[in-house]
Amino acid sequence: MKNKRIYLAPMVGRTDEHYRMFIRILSNNINLYTEMITCDSFIHTDRKSYQVKAKENNLTIQLAGSDPKKYGYCAKMIEDNGYDEINLNIGCPSDKVVKGEFGACLMNSPKLVAECVSEIKRSCDLPVSIKTRLGLGYEEDLDLLYALIDETSVAGCKKYFIHARNAILNGLSPKKNRMIPKLRYQDALIVKRRYSDIEFYLNGGLDDISEIQNNISFFDGVMIGRKIYDDPMFLRVIESELFGNKDIITRDYIVSEYLKYALPLFKKGASNYMLLRHLFSLYYNTSSSKKWKKFLHDIIQHDKDIMLINDFEESIYEENISSYS
């Protein structure tokens, strides 16, 4: 695993600051991402004043938009606020994003994306990366991706996260776009080998440790999203198998550490829903899973003190770890 990196994928409605602090308890090695945020939202909301916390080290902000000047305007504030990297979303296939003329549809406009990269590079000293797809529609050629890389790498982007599927616009939901277009790891590898001086990270469908181990040696690293969200303890498998960290961390410990972060916010008026909603899958694949979800739901629904999560009593169980093998 020397020189290999694992990234937590940006997930809208999920990778907020509370979730990132939760994830950092589970792993010191994973690189963190914000949710996707449009340049307009960054400029006109309190996101522009968010200061990166010390425990969020190696935090990348993912921006979306199509106006180079707005990217440049955001970039300086982002650098001043302590982020480590700026990532451009050139891969989201949702109808809303397409109507806003950003995301995956910008694969058709490589020169415009290159202008966005150039404007960021002129405005700050942070590295710039791009998250994108192999292509658009049902054609499996790589011409669109090659054109995007050729233009943007000259502009200053030397790092790409490749979701190894095409994006199907105007017809498939984001969820179906993660399932119906077939995974093409070999095509992603062809792209990696074509550009020897550029970093490439594999994304898409990486949901067991053997699959990650089989693929990571060919790339500079991997990006994992929903598997970690649905099964956060999978990060402990990653820590053990990829980083050699054999420390045992219990769920009780995770809860107690998270409360050190969450309790002061709760006392200042933060909702227990916003603070606890990312913890529902903590007991994934155990006999305590349903009991835990019901317990957590009761605390949130009745607006109870979040300290009550310390009172949860696990069922006697043996974890089913077949999904990790």
Annotate each PLM feature.
Residues 1-325:
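Flavin-dependent oxidoreductase catalytic cores
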